[in-house]
Amino acid sequence: MSETLLRRRYRFFGAVQGVGLRWRARHAAETLGATGWVCNNADGSVTMELQGSEAQLDRVLQTLAESRYIEILDTEMQQLPLETGERGFSVRDDRW
């Protein structure tokens, strides 16, 4: 039996830019087989869309929470429809 796939958009607030969050997210997602993207926002927050099993998503978030220098003070989360055919995880250009 296969695990149910989920897609969620997260928006992180706190000390989240200039501390390696995007690259850590990419490494964790790629290692775990999750897909999606991450980018910096002009207001100092970071947005990430992540697709995978509940366990994969939880593990990526846990990796970020346990990372040195990254200090997530607040997180907004939104459920999204699945992106069929999506491959890999990318760091997108900043949203300025």
Where are these regions (language model features)?
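Intrinsically disordered, low-complexity, mixed-charge
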Residues: M1-W96
